[in-house]
From Swiss-Prot:
Protein name: Probable electron transfer flavoprotein-ubiquinone oxidoreductase, mitochondrial
Subcellular locations according to the entry: Mitochondrion inner membrane
Start and end residues of each 4Fe-4S ferredoxin-type domain: 592-621
Superkingdom of source: Eukaryota
């Protein structure tokens, strides 16, 4: 008999229909129900008495539009929906996020449970329409954790996986580039270039082979708590809600997933992870996280320009001396070139646009000669952790733990975080299986073993050894001072010093008044190497359902005038997707009206991080919405 996994079912009929299917076919009546009989989507829809969603809008290179609903009205209406009872699905382990960390944890739990002859049900909730659709990285992957998790992975590697052949390092000025030594931490012998989106899809398929249940288009939007304050699970957001927060004809309440342990693997600055960190004061003994914004494109280039396996990084232009960042260009697969720029979000100048800095960076001959004659296929942007050792929060709390970039394990010196994220998932999984062996797991688990054991792995050792590199760029010497200190650290000190440098204290606070700077006149795109933001965002395949609540909450209505006058529209500059803009409005006291084009959001989280007033709040939109990355 043929079977359809729950993950495939969710993809076939849409997330909102799975609740009804599970309810009517028979939800978790027993632990053996890991697969459902194979049927056509239409048959399954008859079972659930639902209809497929038809309300998507695809963003192209077109004029932006936005709805304007009063935040108070929307909040009041959504609050009323919270009184409606949710369907509850009881599982053993709930993982929020089907990225490398979450999937590694899921696979490891299944592996270790099988060895111990236990049945542990693992459910992974993913807000994207498919695993990998929201995954963005360079990516050059160090296979340390992958070798541990799946020792034979090279026999069936991810698509376009390419062994690194050689490294390059360049210092750029506007029209020239100069070779500089490759630091030891950035030498990539034994590593692999690949698309993180493709890698994540591949890893998700491996997880399903182990019996992991992956539910794509399930956007976890709320953490659920017991009466004693411990985490009992999460709830997904509601379907069929209009822009005013009122139920539509196809309304369906979100689903609750209860578990003795919930792992948060949302990636950098996840919305639920942010709330967990605040509620349990997990940053009480560490510094605030600092972030970078990575903006990238994937190109296909002519044979004569292509050097398969080459990994290149750049310093210098277009970054100013007070702005941390650098470029990269990786060549992999079938003539694919991934080119990008990471800009530290602690930059002070509100006129800086990371997305436009990236576009003009490609005009440097170092990049232009490779991209010439090629075709830009995809565009992506995502915030990444740069705080390192100093910014790691407490990882555990009653009923759950933070893993991967939800905690922040990126090694800035290596420009890598996938291997450390995966290792954190592996260590958390081992702690969970051990806890299930000691306990019936009928109550929330406290995974203290996970945190203690992770501190004894290469994850913490790596981050400790390079802890001073990123904050060294904060001195009055700026990037030049940071590069000099980093060279001494890399070749001489190697982290063996009695001091630990500090970060600035938050990226939002680093933003200075526009009065201290001159506006930046970025060159117009040539539509050959450089492109405008609407064209770029169209290459992210971003989709959002029409007539749903705006997932970007602006809590600053009384402060918008002062914010604009002080920072001159910084929101429009830091957003890489054209979500925020100030349009002329004679009726306004300052001649402008703040507009949120939420349908263009690529889920990078920059607004929630960089807004100087910390009044913009990013929340999960309807499940399955957002970008549809395939090669990023």
């Amino acid at each position: 008999m043929s079977y359809l996994s729950r993950s495939a079912l969710a993809r076939s009929v849409g997330a909102k229909h799975l609740t009804g299917v599970l309810r009517k076919i028979g939800r978790r009546g027993g632990r053996s129900m890991h697969v459902l009989p194979l049927a056509s989507p239409s048959t399954l829809l008859k079972i659930s008495s639902q209809t497929l969603r038809q309300d998507f809008t695809v963003l192209g290179a077109r004029n932006f539009h936005s709805s304007s609903v009063r935040l108070n009205e929307l909040t009041d209406n959504l609050r009323k929906l919270d009184t409606i009872e949710r369907e509850v699905e009881d599982v053993d382990v709930c993982i929020v996020g089907a990225g490398p960390a979450g999937l590694s944890a899921a696979i490891r739990i299944k592996q270790q449970a099988a060895k111990a002859n236990r049945d542990i049900r693992v459910v992974v909730l993913e807000k994207a329409a498919e695993p990998g659709n929201h995954s963005v990285s360079g990516a050059v992957i160090q296979p340390t954790a992958l070798d541990e998790l799946l020792p034979n992975w090279r026999d069936d590697p991810p698509e376009n996986c390419t062994a690194v052949t050689h490294d390059k390092m360049k210092f750029l000025i506007p029209k020239l580039h100069f070779p500089i030594p490759v630091p030891p931490a950035m030498k990539n012998h034994g590593n692999y270039v690949m698309s993180l989106a493709e890698f994540t899809r591949w890893l998700a398929a491996k997880a399903e082979e182990y019996g992991v249940e992956i539910y794509p288009s399930f956007a976890a939007s709320e953490v659920l708590y017991n009466k004693d304050g411990s985490v009992i699970g999460v709830a997904t957001n509601d379907f069929g809600v209009d822009s005013k927060g009122l139920p539509k004809d196809n309304f369906e309440r979100g689903m609750a997933f209860h578990a003795p342990v919930t792992l948060f693997a949302e990636g950098a600055h996840g919305s639920l992870s942010k709330s967990i960190i605040k509620r349990f004061n997990l940053r009480g003994n560490c510094e605030p996280q600092t972030y970078g914004l990575g903006v990238k494109e994937v190109w296909r280039v002519p044979d004569e320009n292509f050097r398969k396996g080459e990994v290149a990084h750049t310093l210098g232009w277009p970054m100013r001396n007070d702005t941390y960042g650098g470029g990269f260009m990786y060549q992999f697969g079938d003539n694919y070139v991934t080119v990008g720029l990471v800009v530290g979000l602690d930059y002070p100048n509100p006129y800086v646009s990371p997305a436009l800095e990236f576009q003009r960076m490609k005009q440097n001959p170092f990049f232009a000669k490779v991209l010439k004659g090629g075709k830009c296929l995809e565009y992506a942007a995502r915030a990444l952790n740069e705080g390192g050792y100093q910014a790691i929060p407490k990882l555990v709390f009653p009923g759950g733990a933070l893993i991967g970039c939800s905690a922040g394990f990126v090694n800035v010196a290596k420009i890598k975080g996938t291997h450390t994220a995966m290792k954190s998932g592996i260590v958390a999984a081992d702690a969970i299986v051990d806890a299930f062996g000691r306990d019936a797991a009928s109550k929330p688990l406290l995974l203290n073993d996970y945190e203690e054991n992770l501190k004894n792995t290469y994850v913490f050792k790596e981050l400790y050894s390079v802890r001073n590199i990123r904050p060294s760029f904060h001195s009055f010497l700026g990037n030049y001072g940071g590069m000099a200190y980093s060279a001494v650290e890399a070749y001489v000190l190697k982290g063996r010093v009695p001091w630990t440098l500090k970060h600035k204290g938050g990226d939002a606070k680093a933003t200075k008044s526009a009065s201290k700077y001159k506006p930046i006149n970025y060159p117009k795109p040539d539509n050959v190497l450089s492109f405008d933001i609407p064209t770029s965002v169209s290459r992210s395949a971003t989709m959002h359902a029409e007539n749903q609540p705006c997932h970007l909450f602006d809590h600053r209505p009384k402060d918008r005038k002062s914010c604009f006058e002080t920072y001159k529209g910084v929101e429009n500059k830091f957003c890489p997707a054209g979500v925020y803009e100030y349009v002329n409005d004679e009726a306004s006291s300052y001649g402008k009206r703040f507009v949120i084009n939420s349908q263009n959001c690529v889920h990078c989280k920059t607004c929630d991080i960089k807004d100087p007033l910390q009044g913009i709040q990013w929340k999960t939109p309807q499940g399955g919405d957002g970008p549809k990355y395939t090669l990023t």
